[in-house]
């Protein structure tokens, strides 16, 4: 296949909220440009993971190269990079945008603009991309294109009066959209003769090939068999295979400046080609690496432990392979008295955490226990040193703490006026402080400062229920703020269970302690002796309940006779139970650890 001239290449991605029809539009592009035969087409071609197809969301960014014949008679090479729409995967979006010159802003004509789309669109504009507004789902009876155009102009602030109207489901307007795209989005720039600079947008591990990297060539030309160098590690490899996805893997002889494609260089080390790194030639290397992506900081932390302790090694390998494919996942070894050895993992949000756990269980056949998620707290010790704690059991003694500061997030919410009251009530309940309220044409834009610990747990779900699914949310960490926080310990039979400890606000500690002990009472199986469940702040017990003992009727064999005979048997039973209580261990089921998560949802 001959290398196409740079002026006929267009690199673009699609910005859209969940359910606005992004993956369906991608399917139409592939169909129209003949990327796959009719027999090979299936709905959501690019959502390759089972989880993506089941949940109807895009998690990983995918890339496709298509050939499009325009009305002007020229063939254009369209490199399309699909992006996720959920707030937890926003870092995937910024990586995709770094490889493009333009973006299609797809808005559902019936639903209008969502908060998430606004945030991603600003990222694209900041990176200097040309943004092309597109109205999708115009075939729906409730579609209101005029209102959607007004919202794009009011909320995002870009011209949208000539936005292209399409119905991805029916294929209407898709050809016109591609024609417009070829004209509006500029071709890539970069000298094919310069020293090679290729940005790694994504990497994944293939058990046969090793590390496969998705790259955007910014300058120079990469040929098959070239000796290439990964700039951050300084290690050299040979480019065994290069090519692009149509969406099938298609080998090529070279990728020159402006192209997007994959490289297989026989890298067996999982961390051999980190995302955001630069590839260059080993002999004529580029002077400096390309600016990568800003490192994403995990927001939610939880302990993951294998149920079977023999699975610790396979679990570690699985995490390493997943980390290659998911740059935002962070992990470090951790041991718990209750759960044994495992890892403390950092995620971007609750959906990210669920997806990671589900991928580990499905793709690597592991059985895992998750502890309650927490956020990272800033602690000023009395000696003046600053600590960051993301695990409640690592919190210093109350006497050594000068001040605990919790992370505060700025949440931007877009909601129809009808549900404004319910959403404000929810924000107040979550200890939110209103910063801004703005009435737009058909929606209200609200800005709140809410503690991150409240946002990451169940705020998104609660917001959706409060607004019947109409509200949309975008949040980002802003700063740390001093708060009256305490560590809530759970004691079972007088023993602290480290995996059940949580950090809560003092005002909520009593209610939370009572709810937790009640919930655990239902989940811990009854023993031959009474099991006390207590919630404590430091040495002070704030709630207590107990699991009653199973009772064996030892006096059943006594018919009539002396009362002292019965008393003797009862005393003997009592002494046995007391002895049992001292040595007896209580097995805590997996549901009990999850109870900590669920108390908040009710």
Curated annotation (Swiss-Prot):
Gene Ontology terms: cellular component: plasma membrane
InterPro entries: EF-4, EFG_III/V, EFG_V-like, EFTu-like_2, G_TR_CS, LepA_C_sf, LepA_CTD, LepA_IV
Subcellular location(s) of the protein: Cell inner membrane
Record: residues binding GTP: 19-24, 136-139
Location of the tr-type G domain: 7-189
GO BP, sorted A to Z: positive regulation of translation
GO molecular function, one term: guanosine tetraphosphate binding
Keywords: Cell inner membrane, Cell membrane, GTP-binding, Hydrolase, Membrane, Nucleotide-binding, Protein biosynthesis
Membrane topology field: Peripheral membrane protein
Its EC number(s): 3.6.5.n1
Listed Gene3D superfamilies: 3.30.70.240, Elongation factor 4, C-terminal domain (3.30.70.2570), Elongation Factor G (Translational Gtpase), domain 3 (3.30.70.870), P-loop containing nucleotide triphosphate hydrolases (3.40.50.300), Translation factors (2.40.30.10)
CDD domains: EF4_II (cd03699), EF4_III (cd16260), LepA (cd01890), lepA_C (cd03709)
Keyword Cell membrane set for record: yes
Keyword Membrane in annotation: yes
One Pfam family hit: EFG_C
Catalytic activity: GTP + H2O = GDP + phosphate + H(+)
Family of the protein in this entry: Belongs to the TRAFAC class translation factor GTPase superfamily. Classic translation factor GTPase family. LepA subfamily.
Protein's name in the database: Elongation factor 4
UniProt organism field: Coxiella burnetii (strain RSA 493 / Nine Mile phase I)
């Amino acid at each position: 296949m001959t290398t196409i001239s740079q002026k006929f290449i267009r690199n673009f991605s699609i910005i859209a909220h969940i359910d606005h029809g992004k993956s369906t539009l991608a399917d139409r592009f592939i169909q129209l440009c003949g990327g796959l035969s009719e027999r090979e087409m299936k709905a959501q071609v690019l959502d390759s993971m089972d989880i993506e197809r089941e949940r109807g969301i895009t998690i990983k960014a995918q890339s496709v190269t298509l050939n499009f014949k325009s009305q002007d008679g020229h063939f254009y090479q369209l490199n399309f990079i699909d992006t996720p729409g959920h707030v937890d995967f926003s870092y995937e979006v910024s990586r995709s945008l770094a490889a493009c010159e333009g973006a299609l802003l797809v808005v559902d004509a019936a639903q209008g603009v969502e908060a998430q789309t606004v945030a991603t669109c600003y990222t694209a504009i900041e990176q200097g991309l040309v943004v092309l507004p597109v109205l999708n789902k115009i075939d729906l009876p409730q579609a209101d294109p005029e209102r959607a155009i007004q919202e794009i102009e009011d909320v995002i602030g870009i011209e949208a009066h000539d936005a292209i109207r399409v119905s991805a489901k029916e294929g209407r307007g898709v050809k016109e959209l591609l024609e417009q795209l070829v004209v509006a989005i500029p071709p890539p720039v970069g000298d094919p003769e310069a020293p090679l600079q290729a940005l790694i947008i994504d990497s994944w591990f293939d058990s046969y090939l090793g590390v496969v990297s998705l790259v955007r060539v910014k300058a120079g030309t990469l040929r098959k068999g070239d000796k290439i160098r990964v700039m951050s590690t300084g290690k050299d490899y040979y480019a065994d295979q290069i090519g692009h996805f149509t969406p099938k893997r298609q080998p090529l002889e070279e990728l020159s400046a402006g192209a997007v494609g994959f490289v297989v260089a026989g890298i067996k080390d999982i961390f051999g080609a980190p995302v955001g790194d630069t590839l260059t030639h080993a002999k004529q290397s580029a002077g400096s690496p390309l600016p990568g992506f800003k490192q994403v900081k995990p927001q939610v932390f939880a302990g993951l432990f294998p149920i079977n302790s023999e699975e610790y090694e396979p679990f570690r390998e699985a995490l390493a392979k997943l980390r290659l494919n998911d740059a935002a996942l962070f992990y470090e070894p951790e041991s718990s008295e209750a759960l044994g050895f495992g890892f403390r993992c950092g995620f971007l949000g609750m959906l990210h955490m669920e997806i990671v756990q589900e991928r580990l269980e499905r793709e690597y056949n592991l059985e895992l226990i998750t502890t309650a998620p927490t956020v990272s707290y800033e602690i000023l010790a009395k000696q003046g040193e600053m600590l960051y704690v993301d695990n409640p059991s690592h919190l210093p003694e109350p006497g050594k703490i000068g001040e605990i500061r919790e992370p505060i997030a700025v949440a931007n919410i877009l909601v129809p006026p009808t549900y404004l009251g319910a959403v404000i009530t929810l924000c107040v309940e979550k200890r939110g402080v209103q910063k801004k309220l703005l009435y737009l044409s058909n929606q209200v834009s609200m800005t709140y400062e809410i503690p991150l610990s409240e946002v990451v747990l169940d705020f998104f779900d609660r917001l959706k229920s409060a607004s019947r699914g109409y509200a949309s949310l975008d949040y980002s960490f802003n700063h740390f703020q001093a708060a009256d926080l305490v560590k809530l310990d759970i004691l079972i039979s007088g023993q602290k269970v480290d995996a059940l400890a949580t950090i809560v606000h003092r005002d909520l500690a009593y209610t939370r302690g009572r709810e937790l002990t009640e919930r655990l009472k239902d989940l811990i199986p009854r023993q031959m002796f009474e099991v006390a469940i207590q919630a404590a702040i430091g040495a002070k017990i704030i709630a207590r309940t107990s699991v009653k003992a199973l009772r064996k009727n030892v006096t059943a064999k006594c018919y009539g006779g002396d009362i002292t005979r019965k008393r003797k048997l009862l005393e003997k039973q009592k002494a046995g139970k007391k002895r049992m209580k001292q040595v007896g261990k209580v097995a805590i089921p997996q549901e009990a650890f999850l109870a900590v998560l669920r108390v908040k949802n009710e």
